[in-house]
Amino acid sequence: MRCPKCNYNKSSVVDSRQAEDGNTIRRRRECESCHTRFTTFERLEELPLLVIKKDGTREQFSRDKILNGVVQSAQKRPVSSTDIENLISRIEQKVRTAYENEVSSTVIGNLVMEELAELDEITYVRFASVYKSFKDLDEIEELLQQITNRVRGKKKSSVDDEAY
């Protein structure tokens, strides 16, 4: 594995363990030249999964596209890179389990929104505002009302649980 700092092509594995998603191996490596430590992830190569875009074109599924959208939405929020990596792994696993060769971009976008709603409401709103292409404030207000109702429902059920 090539070192990201000095580009030397030999490194040794210092630590290796299964990642939280269960489908990935996380390896800590150390460059044999400059001794920089870096992390790599190893996962099973899957058959190509095609994403059907809204205009009907098809392109290969890309974790990086989801990553870029989520990272941008999570800027300055208390969302760790591990949280984001796990979120993307869950989405990919759901898609690969439910769809054999092709999936619509709408399905992927909705899965991202479901996961973000559980992770961080502000990140969810930021992602939704781009993904849903809101046309006016009424649409944003409706989304915020849905989130408020969901949060109130969670608080009410946790209060009910404490009463027992």
Curated annotation (Swiss-Prot):
Origin superkingdom: Bacteria
Cofactor(s) required, per the database record: Zn(2+)
Signal sequence, start to end: none
UniProt-listed InterPro entries: ATP-cone_dom (IPR005144), NrdR-like_N (IPR055173), RNR_NrdR-like (IPR003796)
PROSITE patterns registered for this protein in UniProt: ATP_CONE
Coiled coil spans: none
GO biological process, one term: negative regulation of DNA-templated transcription
ZnF (unnamed) intervals: 3-34
Cofactor note (record): Binds 1 zinc ion.
Residues annotated as domain ATP-cone: 49-139
Keywords: ATP-binding, DNA-binding, Metal-binding, Nucleotide-binding, Repressor, Transcription, Transcription regulation, Zinc, Zinc-finger
Function comment: Negatively regulates transcription of bacterial ribonucleotide reductase nrd genes and operons by binding to NrdR-boxes.
Family according to the record: Belongs to the NrdR family.
Name of the protein in question: Transcriptional repressor NrdR
Source species of the chain: Streptococcus equi subsp. zooepidemicus (strain MGCS10565)
